[in-house]
């Protein structure tokens, strides 16, 4: 049995591939159900974000477990294994453990040190527990990954000043505005006519960053008016005009900058729609949705400038170099947490022997206690019987403490195996026969 992770990310696959594997919140239970019924998979959890889809698992056999997960991904995405496999990565054992620690710490993110991934890993843990897909191994691994992410942010400066996907999108808009004026600098968005499509968490972050860059007025477009208004009320210093998605064409005609961030599974803006829009100036569209909210056929369309999450790399690379040294400190924390987990996992090898040893000594204790109590006669009170029984239990616990502690202590697999064999032989435990 082993720990394995299979997935893809912005490092291995373009957005047009990632969006085909994205699993929406509505489809998560169905995905868990499919994976849970596979006889190769013992425990499983799913991490699905705009930049990655990763499936963490505890499997009977690494090769068979990885194949089962790849088969699921092919069926889910509609891609053949020959199309999908070049974009997938898979790790097992220590590599899988280190990977999830790095992910939670923000070290594998498009934006180094970004904080949103930690919330997404927490959500992965919650969803795995709610869908009864995680057992003791993944529970321990993923909760420790969350702790690692918190340590990285509290014990290093990696999270300080880190940009997020939303802030990178705003900076990309500033950069492209500057480039359109022949300047390689971030321009103020104060005079831009801004619209945001979507009223979720990413849109909230967009408004925060736009406000900090001089934007004091914008349109917020959503499928439901109520959710848009609720978000607008949280920003009293920004003049936010709410509209329904049905009125999107009006914003396509009158805005100069539109951000899209909805959970729609299909594009809401495509070339056919934009060709019907009459404009006097270029409309800049920045899509941070996965699956994409803006169709790929918009790129290259005259009068429109479209960008997706993969284009954020242009902004991110401007901020990364100064953070690399801090990242080395975070990597050291990740290595430390990885070792702690692997030592715990290795110690589980001793559990069957420890349980049999405890059971064997407990049988002896009960037998000898019964003999002693029978010799005490009827004059021996119930209180005195409880004292003697507690004494016998205390003796057993004292005897077990040192060997159990030593068996669970960090050591090489070969040394632990020798210790287990010695105890099994001396106490005639017969572990191999019982398994």
Swiss-Prot record:
SUPFAM superfamilies in the cross-refs: Glutamyl tRNA-reductase catalytic, N-terminal domain (SSF69742), Glutamyl tRNA-reductase dimerization domain (SSF69075), NAD(P)-binding Rossmann-fold domains (SSF51735)
GO biological process, one term: chlorophyll biosynthetic process
Residue positions binding NADP(+): 198-203
Gene3D superfamilies: Glutamyl-tRNA reductase, N-terminal domain, NAD(P)-binding Rossmann-like Domain
Catalytic residues as annotated in Swiss-Prot or TrEMBL: 50
Residues that hold substrate according to the record: 49-52, 109, 114-116, 120
Annotated transmembrane regions: none
Pathway(s) the chain acts in: Porphyrin-containing compound metabolism; protoporphyrin-IX biosynthesis; 5-aminolevulinate from L-glutamyl-tRNA(Glu): step 1/2; Porphyrin-containing compound metabolism; chlorophyll biosynthesis
EC number: 1.2.1.70
Residue(s) at site: Important for activity: 99
This protein's UniProt keywords: Chlorophyll biosynthesis, NADP, Oxidoreductase, Porphyrin biosynthesis
InterPro entries in the record: 4pyrrol_synth_GluRdtase (IPR000343), 4pyrrol_synth_GluRdtase_dimer (IPR015896), 4pyrrol_synth_GluRdtase_N (IPR015895), GluRdtase_CS (IPR018214), GluRdtase_dimer_dom_sf (IPR036453), GluRdtase_N_sf (IPR036343), NAD(P)-bd_dom_sf (IPR036291), Shikm_DH/Glu-tRNA_Rdtase (IPR006151)
NCBIfam families for this protein: hemA, PRK00045.1-3
Miscellaneous: During catalysis, the active site Cys acts as a nucleophile attacking the alpha-carbonyl group of tRNA-bound glutamate with the formation of a thioester intermediate between enzyme and glutamate, and the concomitant release of tRNA(Glu). The thioester intermediate is finally reduced by direct hydride transfer from NADPH, to form the product GSA.
Protein family according to the UniProt entry: Belongs to the glutamyl-tRNA reductase family.
Protein name: Glutamyl-tRNA reductase
Organism per entry: Prochlorococcus marinus (strain MIT 9211)
GN (gene name): hemA
């Amino acid at each position: 049995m082993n720990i394995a992770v299979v997935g893809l990310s912005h490092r291995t696959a373009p957005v047009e591939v990632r969006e085909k594997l994205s699993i929406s919140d509505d489809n998560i239970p169905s995905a868990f159900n499919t994976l849970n019924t596979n006889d190769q998979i013992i425990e499983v959890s799913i991490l699905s974000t705009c930049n990655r889809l990763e499936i963490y698992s505890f499997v009977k056999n690494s090769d068979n477990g990885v194949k089962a997960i790849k088969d699921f991904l092919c069926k889910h995405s509609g891609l053949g294994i020959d199309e999908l496999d070049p974009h997938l990565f898979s790790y097992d054992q220590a590599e899988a453990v280190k990977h999830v620690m790095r992910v939670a710490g923000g070290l594998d993110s498009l934006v180094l040190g970004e904080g949103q991934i930690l919330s997404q890993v927490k959500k992965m843990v919650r969803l795995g527990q709610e869908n009864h897909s995680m057992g003791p191994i993944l529970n321990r691994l993923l909760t420790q990954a969350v702790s690692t992410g918190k340590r990285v942010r509290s014990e290093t400066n990696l999270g300080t000043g880190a940009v997020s996907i939303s802030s990178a999108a705003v900076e990309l808009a500033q950069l492209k505005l500057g480039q359109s004026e022949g300047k390689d600098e971030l321009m103020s968005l104060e005079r831009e006519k801004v619209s945001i499509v979507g009223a979720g968490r990413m849109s909230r972050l967009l408004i925060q960053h736009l406000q900090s860059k001089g934007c004091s007025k914008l349109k917020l477009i959503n499928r439901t008016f109520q959710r848009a208004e609720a978000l607008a009320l949280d920003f009293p210093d920004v003049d936010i005009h709410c509209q329904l998605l049905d009125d999107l064409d009006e914003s396509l005609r009158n805005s100069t900058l539109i951000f899209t961030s909805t959970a729609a599974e299909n594009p809401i803006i495509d070339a056919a729609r934009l060709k019907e829009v009459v404009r006097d100036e270029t409309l800049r569209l920045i899509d941070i949705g996965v699956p994409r909210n803006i169709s790929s056929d918009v790129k290259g369309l005259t009068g429109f400038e479209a960008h997706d999450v993969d284009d954020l790399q242009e902004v991110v690379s401007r901020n990364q170099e100064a953070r690399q040294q801090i990242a080395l400190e975070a990597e050291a924390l990740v290595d430390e947490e990885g070792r702690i987990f692997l030592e715990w996992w290795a110690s589980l090898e001793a559990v069957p022997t420890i349980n049999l040893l405890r059971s064997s000594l407990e049988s002896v204790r009960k037998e000898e206690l019964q003999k002693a109590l029978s010799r005490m006669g009827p004059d021996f009170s119930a209180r005195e019987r409880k004292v003697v029984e507690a004494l016998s239990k205390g003796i057993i616990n004292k005897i077990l403490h040192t060997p159990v502690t030593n068996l669970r202590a960090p050591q090489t697999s070969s040394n632990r195996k020798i210790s287990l064999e010695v105890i099994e032989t001396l106490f005639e435990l017969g572990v191999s026969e019982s398994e």
